[in-house]
Amino acid sequence: MESRDIILRPVVTEATMATMDDKRYTFDVDVRATKTQVKHAIEDIFDVKVVKVNVMNLKGKKKRQGRYEGYTKKRRKAIVSLSADSKEIKLFNEE
């Protein structure tokens, strides 16, 4: 897998924005990606030094359309901790 295929999107919530001050960033990643692949992808894309990667698997939510039931797709979330001397990841364009 390519680095751009592993990292899908950043997760932007109040909780994740609060952890960005401590150089901890949260991303949605491919469900097949390992911690090592996530680490190499982040270092390759953003040119930073990753210290630790925590991942969590999220089940799909149950949804209904009339009498038919189904599930949304499952997700995998990665929390990436950067080293103290690495630069910040710019997620937003500040003009």
UniProtKB/Swiss-Prot annotation:
InterPro entries: Nucleotide-bd_a/b_plait_sf (IPR012677), Ribosomal_uL23-like (IPR013025), Ribosomal_uL23/eL15/eS24_sf (IPR012678). Pfam families: Ribosomal_L23 (PF00276). Keywords: Ribonucleoprotein, Ribosomal protein, RNA-binding, rRNA-binding. GO terms for molecular function: rRNA binding; structural constituent of ribosome. One of its GO terms (cellular component) is ribonucleoprotein complex. SUPFAM superfamilies: Ribosomal proteins S24e, L23 and L15e. GO terms for biological process: translation. Belongs to the universal ribosomal protein uL23 family. Part of the 50S ribosomal subunit. Contacts protein L29, and trigger factor when it is bound to the ribosome. One of the early assembly proteins it binds 23S rRNA. One of the proteins that surrounds the polypeptide exit tunnel on the outside of the ribosome. Forms the main docking site for trigger factor binding to the ribosome. This is Large ribosomal subunit protein uL23. It comes from Levilactobacillus brevis (strain ATCC 367 / BCRC 12310 / CIP 105137 / JCM 1170 / LMG 11437 / NCIMB 947 / NCTC 947).
